[in-house]
Design a protein with these regions (language model features):
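N-terminal nicking endonuclease/strand-transfer module with a His-rich metal-binding environment
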Residues: 1-205
């Protein structure tokens, strides 16, 4: 088995996206919320590295995370453009959810811990302690992680259509650098009666 570092891509279909999940991806959090989420087991978000997080906006532009329109709003606006009614927000175990199509696909891109963090921080000494004593406010973001994100964004734009990317957020405040990409899965289908094509939002997976 090869020991070469490998990249990772995980994806999951969702019925919708809520404000809480969107806020986490876009880090629309204040200091108090960081403290609250860090009380949960297996969670740690370093607020002193929050300044390193970023998003890729339309055109492949790097900008501060959370400065663009909330993802849940972009989701509704894009569906309106397509003439598709958004699913109501329901819990996964709700029987009604089984009848709904997946209107969101959430991707997470990451890779080998050492490689990802080298791209993000270079040779800077980052303190990964989880006891709240770390101060990484002086750490700077490396260009390599930005280029990695832009390359991913370009690939997804070509594959799914840039207009269907409603969120592309890179997190450098956790253990390993990673990216959350949120897309609306649009396919064109031909109506049997009219022969006309119409957009359908659906992902089976």
């Amino acid at each position: 088995m090869s020991n070469e570092p490998k990249g990772a891509m995980h994806f999951e279909g969702r019925k919708s996206i809520g404000a809480m999940e969107a806020a986490e991806n876009q880090r629309r959090w204040d200091e108090k919320h960081y403290q609250t989420v860090n009380k949960k087991p297996l969670h740690w978000y370093d607020i002193t590295r929050a300044h390193l997080n970023f998003e890729v906006a339309k055109g492949g532009i790097i900008q501060k995370i959370g400065t663009s329109k909330p993802v849940e709003e972009r989701f509704k606006e894009r569906l309106e453009e397509l003439g598709v009614k958004p699913n109501p927000e329901v819990k996964k175990n709700n029987p009604a959810a089984a009848k709904m199509s997946n209107q969101i696909v959430e991707f997470v891109f990451s890779g080998d811990h050492e490689v990802m963090n080298m791209m993000a921080f270079g040779n800077q000494a980052v303190d990964f302690e989880r006891d709240g004593t770390a101060d990484n406010s002086h750490i700077q973001r490396m260009n390599e992680i930005e280029q990695w994100a832009i390359d991913l964004y370009d690939w997804m734009a070509k594959k799914y259509g840039e207009e269907n990317i409603i969120g592309f957020d890179v997190h450098l405040d956790e253990t390993t650098a990673h990216c959350h990409a949120t897309i609306i899965p649009v396919v064109m289908r031909t109506e049997k009666k009219t022969g006309r094509e119409r957009p359908v939002v659906s992902y089976k997976g």
